[in-house]
Amino acid sequence: MSLLRKFKIMHMRINGFYGGKARWWLSAKQYDQKYNTQYTASQKKWAYKHGFLPAVVERYGINDSNVEDFISLYDYCHIFPVNDIFRKWINDRVTTRNVLKPFAQYLPEQYFHLYRRDTDIQVVKLLDCPAEYEESYDGILQLIRDKGKVSLAKTLGTNFITLACEDGQYSIDGEAVSDEELISRIQDIRSVLVLMEYVECGQAMKSLEPSNSNYLKLIVYNKYGDNPKVGQAYLSLNTGKPSGYREVFESDGSVSMGSEEDLDAKNQSDVQASDTEIDQDDDTIGRNFMESEVVLPRRDQQPKVTRRVFVPVSLEDGSFDGGKQLVGNTITELDQHPVTGAALKGRIDNMAQLLELVETIGKFIPQIEYMSIDVVLTDDGFKMVDFSAHPSYPQVVGFNEEMTDYLKLKVRLKKEEASKWENKKKNFKKKSNTFLWIRLTRFLCPPKMRPLIYKWWYITMKDDLFSKNGVPLKTKRWAYKHGFLSYRLEQYGIDETNYKN
């Protein structure tokens, strides 16, 4: 990373940016400047000046006369995180299930939590797992046999894969596997996963598109803390073969330790090398922040068609009439589904009940001011299968006037706070301290040592050094050199002959 880029990130963080979003915006601009040859230098300059990428400007027809009617990418990055530390309540599936325990009937049942500790995969039973299933691979296989189908997803991800068993034959997303192969793939995971209920789309949704990856997205805001409201709703319909396999089995995952606000030392690519979309932050926040919204074609590349159709839904009566799809960089209006030919017209019968429930949930967790909820509409009701504390910047269905007004209010308040001199000094001190600890950790510590842990070690070691615990200074120096606190030596009988044990 160049010195100039580091300075720009520091400047943005002093002015209230979260580090991951500052890096995302700078990376998006850098990638766009380097690879996007479809726009002139003046078009790019205008877009960047107003906080957009030129592709987004063209897509929505943004110009000098209407630019104030839109929330820019830059500003949307700036207001992150709207929900502050409480965002963790709904960004992690297991935490969400525990927080929303009174609403469990509207959430998928969760059976097992799977995560790697050292070299082993830990299998932990969750709230909804029946007592007869053991915390083991045998318990998982028995559950799949009994249920027929279950879903497997990252706790911090957006995609699902289906594990099934029919007539004794196991499968992963329709691919036949043996029980040994299924367990082997689970043992190879690098992410934190949750095994949960398979939620089947109702026939009304399957009449539009027959796969099981269609959902209703609700964007919710709670402007004053006591008036949660759904500001926007649309159906997201599949148009191709859905697959969450790579996200679940092949992508890396980590468990956060400490505050990401203080120490955001995760290494990320500055410019994406192989695809047409900007890499998103893969941390415990903003996990689906962009969701492939920013499509940046390379030279001579064919127009890209998004795999989904978006159908705006009326909040008054749940009706919908017509959808939209992104072809290349053009938003195309649709009356029919492009694959099935089904008319994109109908009504969600239980919309009023759903909106009332969302309002109740919003009042139950008033700390969550802004979120999105993905709802699978079933034959007998609905299930809320995913929550996000910072909904994706819209790809096709832009924020409506109500949501834009709310987000612009958040932008104005954020900029007012960031402009105060005392806040600038506070942010500078905080970010400088973070920068120092990151560099010290990389220089002095073994690979993959987390800066927050090294900071804790340094402070604890300092306290131990000046404590009057009867341990000689020479012995303390030996303890610190070998990674121990001095009082532990006598407690565990540690000396030169056994410290490696």
Spell out what each predicted region is.
Residues 1-45, 58, 63-64, 69, ...:
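Alpha-helical membrane-targeting segments
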Residues 36-40, 44, 50-65, 254, ...:
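Extended, charge-rich helix/loop segments that form flexible
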Residues 108-164, 170-172, 187-195:
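Glycine- and small hydrophobic-enriched segments that form the cores of compact globular domains
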Residues 330-359, 363-368, 377-501:
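C-terminal active-site "lid" helix and adjoining low-complexity regulatory extension at the edge
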